Regions:
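Class II aminoacyl-tRNA synthetase catalytic cores and aaRS-like
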Residues: 1-600
Length: 600
């Protein structure tokens, strides 16, 4: 049974209504404001977690108690509830006020000036907000995001338990392994020169649970990756709904999340409509070709068309020898200034330029690169299926660059054109059949594209053919899948490779032999040699999910105590230097410190 009444209060600041008029009550909270309107007469606002209540000071003794208090002091007030003369319909407590008879200061605010106005903290500089996060969180708007996070996590936990999953925690101190991002390392005092790693994900542990005979596992798992921040990615640590199922394939995983997520999104989201099950399945290659992204926003009805054959030889320099992609928009009413901004935004986000022309109501090619398109108008109109009044946005470059730029262009145009985007809904889809391998941007060598523990389509046979040169490794797809909602990647998952022979063969293609696999993944390799069930899983990002539900653009808005973009905790002063004694105990010598870098 929930109770809000404590030793310090009989009611909360969001609780009092007309039925309480005439009662003597005790409230406790933060002094949000005091406004003097006459001699010994003032209005005060008391705020707690639950709401605000107006307090009316009407005598000298009470005014003396309030007069010397700074905003944000915590006080206990005992007084009588009465009906307001001037009601405030915007507040749940707007029909009443409290006339205090006794005031006790519980925690005095010793600062005459606050770093920012509490109720407008979101307008303040982010560094100030993060340094004084305990003040920022007093803002109801900021606080409500954290409440939403708690509600969503509770709903996810209940849903998974109802589906027969067991919540099992896995180790935080583990071994370093090559999972993609940089590890956070923890030195061992007892074993000089050796290090633990904070887990990038519970990947190996959850697979080992399946090998141990558990059927369904989940946890709200902390994950640690030393990677740069983005708007939808927090540096350092994040949380995911980690889950795994034994004797299951990807359709079994899909069925669980398709049952769990839509009602949670409809209940807690900004929008009340969520796409029903089954979610649409889109192959990775189709997504890149038609949407220019492996996380397409399906609320936008625009698609990408290949225009290489139609425009590659039009004489426009950037198109020559490159892939050309087009996004055709009907009913476009943007001005030249707005078009220029759209193109500039595409270049900033994708690193590639965007181009354009119109097919006007008179059937003429005008604007942008029209002079290059006009001579081949009929062929272009036919190839792109243009109707009079169309706007055509274009990108060009190597295949992947042109695709990604077109994806950004599609998103920008969709957001700009209300008739092409149904914003007020949650549109889910599964992206499937990801490439198993890719050529690394830095190494120029074959690398795993996503999860190295995924089962390849074609199994051992396709890997052996690739090793023999009979199949291009880049053509191999894996049983890997992403869950996407409104253009946000919520989760990645896969059918796991549970056969040690297939595991070794998969790693050999990226220049790691059987001995390397045994050395880097000893527990999992050995466990699988004892027989392991086919298993599959997924791990939706909790932070990213709540960000989407809250309608926020920055993931820091839904994390109680986030780091800044430079992976610094400004409130706690982390990372920080430690004492020489601590370093000596760990047998660590620092060869370079941050001041050295600043001096260079």
């Amino acid at each position: 049974m929930q109770t809000t009444h404590t030793h310090y209060r009989t009611h909360t600041c969001g609780e009092l209504r007309m039925e309480h008029v005439g009662q003597t009550v005790t409230l406790a909270g933060f002094l949000e404001n005091v406004r003097e309107v006459g001699q010994n007469f003032a209005f005060a606002v008391l705020r707690d977690f639950y709401g605000v209540t107006q307090v009316v000071v009407e005598n000298e003794a009470m005014w003396k108690a309030f007069k010397g208090l700074n905003k944000e002091s915590t006080v206990q007030i005992t007084g009588v509830v009465r009906e307001r003369d001037s009601k405030n319909p915007k507040l749940p407590t707007g029909d009443i006020e409290v006339v205090p008879e006794a005031v006790e200061v519980l925690g005095r605010c010793r600062h005459n000036e606050l770093p920012f106005q509490i109720n407008r903290s979101r307008e303040a500089d982010e560094s100030a907000r993060l340094k004084y996060r305990y003040l920022d969180l007093r803002n109801p708007e900021v606080k409500n995001n954290i409440i939403l996070r708690c509600q969503v996590v509770a709903a996810l936990r209940k849903a998974l338990l109802d589906h027969g999953f067991l919540e099992i925690t896995t180790p935080i101190l583990t071994a370093s392994s090559p999972e993609g991002a940089r590890d956070y390392l923890v030195p061992s005092r007892k074993h000089p020169g050796k290090f633990y790693a904070l887990p990038q994900a519970p990947q190996q542990f959850k697979q080992l649970l399946m090998a141990s005979g558990f059927d369904k596992y989940f946890q709200i798992a902390p994950c640690f990756r030393d990677e740069d921040a983005r708007g939808d990615r927090s540096p350092g640590e994040f949380y995911q709904l980690d889950m795994e199922m034994a004797f299951a394939d990807q359709e079994d995983v899909f069925a669980v999340l398709e049952d769990v997520l839509p009602p949670i999104f409809a209940q807690y989201g900004t929008y009340t409509v969520a796409s029903p099950a089954p979610f649409r399945h889109i192959s990775y290659r189709y997504a890149m070709d038609k949407y220019g992204s492996d996380k397409p926003d399906l609320r936008i009805d625009l698609t990408v068309t290949d225009a290489t054959e139609a425009l590659g030889a039009c004489g426009f320099g950037p198109f020559e020898g490159n892939t050309v992609k087009a996004v055709v928009v009907t009913g476009f009413e943007g001005t030249r200034k707005q078009i220029d901004k759209l193109c500039a935004d595409v270049e900033v986000q994708s690193g590639e330029k965007a181009y354009w022309f119109r097919y006007d109501e008179n059937g003429e090619i005008v604007g942008g690169i029209a002079k290059f398109v006009q001579p081949m108008k009929d062929a272009v109109v036919a190839a792109l299926g243009l109707e009079k009044g169309c706007f055509v946005g274009l990108t060009a470059g190597k295949l992947l660059a042109a695709q990604k730029a077109a994806g950004v262009l599609r998103s920008k145009l969709g957001a700009f054109c209300p008739n092409h985007m149904d914003k007020e809904r949650y549109e889910f889809c599964w992206i499937v059949d990801f490439p198993m391998y890719e050529i690394g941007e830095e190494s120029g060598l074959l690398e795993f594209c996503h999860n190295p523990f995924s089962m390849p389509n074609g199994g051992l046979e396709i890997l052996k053919k690739a090793a023999a040169g009979e199949v291009d490794p880049l053509s191999i797809t894996a049983f890997q899948y992403d869950l996407v909602c409104n253009g946000v990647e919520l989760s990645s998952g896969a059918v796991r490779n549970h056969d040690p022979e297939i595991m070794v063969e998969a790693f050999q293609l990226v220049r790691l032999g059987e001995d390397d696999v045994k050395a880097k993944f000893p527990a999992m390799y050995n466990a699988f040699t004892y027989g392991a069930p086919p298993h599959a899983g997924i791990a939706p990002g909790v932070d990213r999910m709540v960000m989407l539900l809250a309608g926020e653009d920055s993931i820091r808005e839904i994390i109680p105590f986030p780091m800044n973009k430079n992976a610094q905790d400004l409130m706690m002063g982390a990372p920080s230097f430690v004492t020489q004694a601590q370093l000596d105990e760990l047998n660590i010598v620092c060869t370079k410190k941050e001041e050295d870098e600043a001096a260079e």
